[in-house]
Amino acid sequence: MSGNTLGLLFTVTTFGESHGPAIGAVADGCPPGMLLTEADIQLDLDRRKPGTSRHVTQRKEEDKVEILSGVFEGKTTGTPIALLIRNTDQRSQDYGDILQTFRPGHADYAYQYKYGIRDPRGGGRSSARLTAPVVAAAVIAKKWLHEKYGTEFYGYMSQLGELEIPFKDASEIEKNPFFAANAELIPQLETYMDELRRAGDSCGARIEVRARNVPAGLGEPLFDKLDADIAHAMMGINAVKGVEIGAGFRSVVQRGSEHGDELHSDGFASNNSGGTLGGISSGQDLRVSIAIKPTSSIMSPKQSVDLSGKPIIVQTKGRHDPCVGIRATPIAEAMLALVLMDHVLRHRAQCADVSTSISPIPASQPGSFHD
């Protein structure tokens, strides 16, 4: 397979390029009978779409979704759900020079070497524009999981460049363009981005994503562990260079006496595992963190070569996000939802008739707090 499909029983296949006429996804495996409208999907697309603040690309895409199939009289039919998002604000003239050149940090060289041809306009298939249909398809998963299990997803930015953003108040996340849970730091974040843009530079970010009310038992050891598939999906997001589950790399400096999450009849005492044990969900919150690299498209000149290997200087033109992490929160939520949906259906297929005398352990002890 050519890597355009995620999942085994709930699958999402995306198509399109950044400056093509449209982008989209086909979601297959959704159980029949769930109410679904374009308005349901639009809510999350609006959280991700470009041009919503001065700190992101000024490309103005409405990202209006069209449901082409798989829904009849407002209900899913159990057949493939095709979703289409038309591109309306392409400026392909900004990319005329890069057909013969390779932009440092971009996929240009790798795509050209692999395929022998590439669409240079806006990065073509490698553009973060292709995360829009992923977000759209994930609404199907989010809605079904919430109705079936009460599963909830949320994410937030915990670091912008060098600036750490301590978690303060979840109600603030949707009130600012950074998805930051700390209203006090918004002026500082805005100043930081303004200075970065004036310098013609970019920065990275760290995004946290959580899932609550996750059923226990999801995951297929050894090679389709739940956390392995989560990491696989998160690395499929543009510009992601690192993934942590639970304590992640902090596990290196922890002692076993600290890292192991104690089990009590009234709940887990901590969640260093991030919601999985042995690759199977424990019923605790899933805790995932992703590291996003600085945007490669910057105004500052950088050295590169052209198709013939001749040295050149590349200075990127066009409309770009100085930090792609600013719009990454709904994308990370989407990937987590897609993986969970797939594993729920896989678990039902294999273990629906399994009965156990074990009582489920609550996700956390009363009074404990895990963001």
Swiss-Prot record:
GO cellular component: cytosol
CDD domains per the UniProt record, alphabetical: Chorismate_synthase (cd07304)
InterPro entries: Chorismate_synth, Chorismate_synth_AroC_sf, Chorismate_synthase_CS
Any one Pfam family match given in the protein's UniProt record, by short name: Chorismate_synt
Protein residues bound to FMN: R125, S126, S127, N238, A239, G278, K293, P294, T295, S296, S297, R319
Role this protein plays: This reaction introduces a second double bond into the aromatic ring system.
Name of the protein in question: Chorismate synthase
Organism this protein belongs to: Polynucleobacter necessarius subsp. necessarius (strain STIR1)
Primary gene name: aroC
